[in-house]
Amino acid sequence: MPGAFPLVGTMAALQEEHFQGADMPTIDPSLRPGKVSKWGEWVKSKPLAVNGVETRWRILGKYDLVSTNEDGTIGLIDCKVSDSQRDTGQFYSPQLEAYAYSLENPAAGKGQTVASMGLLVWKPTHAIGTSVDDYGFGVFQKYIPIERDQENFLKVIGEFITVLEGELPEPGAECATCNYLLARNALN
């Protein structure tokens, strides 16, 4: 998605770089003692199970920040540069739960317990600088904790996999895509 919005990738990279090695309580006092120890790494889960049966489906994603906490757990932070009202825990919960699932159930290696997850939002508020060489943006920073809800995440992803693996429904007369595919397949 950052390719569609060129500055999003640049701003996200600046935000991630800024917090490399940061003490978690300096990001937000509500966070457990620890330090940001990883950033921008890919995670891949073991195969997901639906109704106790292993599927061919896995989760693959790239998180922004992970902390190693003093109590042996980890924290997960997704960085956002935005002024959107949708920057809420509810909107981003599935994304963070997917990363958390992958960290706790990795395809290889030992899983780690994700004790906290949240959004670190930078909202640009003003321009700063006094010369051509040092202009920038000031931001309002807000940490938004996201409650873990792995049970709901696994339920929704299970329903999604069931649809993907299920029988294809009969095409409807009003479905333009269905009609196109039927006509296209008839050419073969």
Give the residues covered by each predicted segment.
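Hydrophobic, Leu/Ile/Phe/Ala-enriched alpha-helical segments that form helix-helix packing faces
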Residues: 22-26, 103, 107, 164
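A generic fold-level signal
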Residues: 58-60, 91, 170
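Short beta-strand-loop-alpha-helix junction that forms the active-site gateway
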Residues: 79-88
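An active-site-proximal "capping" alpha-helix that borders the catalytic cofactor pocket
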Residues: 93-106
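Conserved active-site beta-strand-loop modules that form the wall/rim of enzyme catalytic pockets
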Residues: 64-66, 72-79, 115-118
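Metal-dependent nuclease catalytic cores that hydrolyze phosphodiester bonds in DNA/RNA
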Residues: 1-73
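Metal-dependent nuclease catalytic regions and adjoining charged, substrate-binding loops involved
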Residues: 106-188
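Short alpha-helix boundary/capping segments
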Residues: 87-94, 145
